[in-house]
Design a protein with these regions (language model features):
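C-terminal active-site subregion of NodB/CE4 polysaccharide deacetylases
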Residues: 1-65, 71-72, 188-189, 199-202, ...
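Metal-dependent polysaccharide deacetylase catalytic core of the NodB/CE4 family, i.e.
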Residues: 20-23, 59-62, 82-242, 269-275
Length: 296
């Protein structure tokens, strides 16, 4: 009860608006999360960014964003937004929409296989991962994708996958992406917005200037061609400080009106191309949701 009272007191004193970030979450949990934040008002991402740009108040306003374009997540939660008249932004990584699984999905597949089949990690000829615990292995793989380039990431992950499971057989159970026809149909509604999450979902800090430009420009063009609407926001893959560098922020400023991270915080005196978001997950109770928002 005391924590609840403190949370409510802090929430009432907060001045800046905020951007929520979701990944894979059930529609029931998503709806409960948003309703727990009312009467604060969900508004379009573009609008909250514009208010922030002009120095206008964003108090008691927030924007809803979903990363990665997982089909079930997008379709089911879009229905929730439609029912409640909530504006929502979906960040799409283009290669995933075109059929290529995301690196973190491969790691989760490795983790699942390890937990189901092995008491310890099976023998590997990779000297970097000999005599390593399963927990440590998964932590190291996640650490790697936050800072490494696409070729290294895929090389390592495919190496492990081939050793411990039949990838061609099991990948059918991996999360499917939304398809372009579905993107086009949803985009017809004014409540929806599809924005860029790059091409390959690779940390931009691991890329050359040419690669960063390609990720940003090509993804922007692909979505605009599909929806016929302007793509004005970029979401940095992984979103952590170590996954973003000064060069990527500078390049984003040339092609977009804003760019978002997964660094927790509210919209205060933030760089428009390094905007914080508040991440919410399936396991978060509504009390924790309000606490996260209160302390951000």
């Amino acid at each position: 009860k005391l924590i609840f009272q403190i949370t409510e007191k802090v929430l009432n004193k907060q001045s800046g608006g905020y951007i929520l970030s979701f990944h894979e979450v059930s529609p029931e949990v998503f709806e409960s999360h948003i309703k727990s934040l009312l009467p604060s008002k969900p508004i379009p991402l573009e609008e909250i960014v514009q208010r922030h740009r002009l120095g206008k108040s964003t108090k008691e306003c927030f924007a809803i964003t979903f990363d990665d374009g997982v089909r079930n997540t997008v379709l089911k939660n879009w229905e929730v937004c439609l029912k409640n008249n909530w504006p929502v932004t979906f960040y799409l990584p283009i290669n995933y929409i075109n059929g290529e699984n995301l690196p973190y999905q491969k790691i989760l597949l490795i983790e699942k296989s390890l937990n189901e089949k092995f008491d310890s990690f099976p023998q590997t000829d990779d000297k970097n991962f000999k005599n390593i615990s399963k927990k440590k292995l998964i932590a190291e793989l996640f650490k790697m994708i936050y800072v490494s380039n696409k070729s290294k990431v895929n090389s390592y992950l495919d190496h492990f996958i081939k050793q411990i499971l039949d990838y061609d057989k099991i990948k059918q159970s991996m999360p499917k992406a939304i398809n372009w026809n579905e993107v086009r149909e949803i985009s017809k509604n004014y409540l929806s917005s599809f924005q860029s999450h790059g091409l390959s979902h690779t940390a931009v800090s691991a890329m050359s200037e040419k690669e960063i430009k390609s990720e940003m420009v090509e993804s922007k063009n692909a979505i605009e061609e599909c929806t016929g609407k302007k793509v004005n926001s970029f979401c940095y893959p992984y979103g952590a400080a170590r996954s973003i560098n000064k060069l990527s922020v500078e390049i984003a400023s040339k092609y977009f009106d804003s760019a978002t991270t997964l660094i927790r915080g509210r919209l205060k005196k933030n760089n428009l191309y390094y905007l914080p978001r508040i991440d919410l997950y399936e396991e978060n109770e509504t009390s924790l949701v309000r606490l996260k928002v209160a302390i951000s």
